[in-house]
Each structure stands twice: as C-alpha cells, then as structure tokens.
Amino acid sequence: MGRSLKKGPFCDEHLMKKIEKLNETGQKQVIKTWSRRSTIFPQFVGHTIAVYDGRKHVPVYITEDMVGHKLGEFAPTRTFRGHAGDDKKTKR
C-alpha cells in the first residue's frame, strides 16, 4: 500500500538541508545517511548518497530514473550466498 497523495512524499529534514546546502555551494561530496525511508527528490540528482544497509554505508549515485523511489531500495540489506549444491554429483 502506497502513501496517501494528500500527504505528499516524505524526506527527512536533515537530509534535505544537507542537499540544499550542497546545491547552493555547488559542491559534490558524499552524504552519509541512515534514512532509508526518504523519497528521492529531483534536487538529489547528481549527488552521491551513502545509504546505511545495517553493516556499512553503500554509496548510491542518484540519477533521474531514481526520482520518486526510496533510498533504501538501492542499498540491499541481505547478501545472497547461493543455494546449496546438488549432492547427486558428489555421490557418483
């Protein structure tokens, strides 16, 4: 279930302030954040945001295609190690 349209998209205030400050100065530096729940706005395009995945910060370069999605969608939290091997090959 998506967010109500009358509420509008959500973005943490501290993250938005950091982006606006960088846009004013024209700097491009990595922004560390723990806010996986924040929606990506058009102002974020061109910036690199390091999103926390539970272990480390994963650098995510924001493009136009990502606008409207959440930051957490681009920093996976689980590492897939693969399924168990087939025992039939080893028995022969």
UniProtKB/Swiss-Prot annotation:
UniProt entry keywords in alphabetical sequence: Ribonucleoprotein, Ribosomal protein, RNA-binding, rRNA-binding
Signal peptide: none
Classification via InterPro entries: Ribosomal_uS19 (IPR002222), Ribosomal_uS19_bac-type (IPR005732), Ribosomal_uS19_CS (IPR020934), Ribosomal_uS19_SF (IPR023575)
One GO term describing the cellular component: cytoplasm
GO molecular function annotation: rRNA binding; structural constituent of ribosome
Biological processes per GO annotation: ribosomal small subunit assembly; translation
Any single Pfam family the record assigns to this protein: Ribosomal_S19
Record keyword Protease present: no
PROSITE patterns on file: RIBOSOMAL_S19 (PS00323)
Entries under Gene3D superfamilies matching the protein: 30s Ribosomal Protein S19, Chain A (3.30.860.10)
UniProt similarity note: Belongs to the universal ribosomal protein uS19 family.
Function noted in UniProt: Protein S19 forms a complex with S13 that binds strongly to the 16S ribosomal RNA.
HAMAP family xref list: Ribosomal_uS19 (MF_00531)
Name of protein: Small ribosomal subunit protein uS19
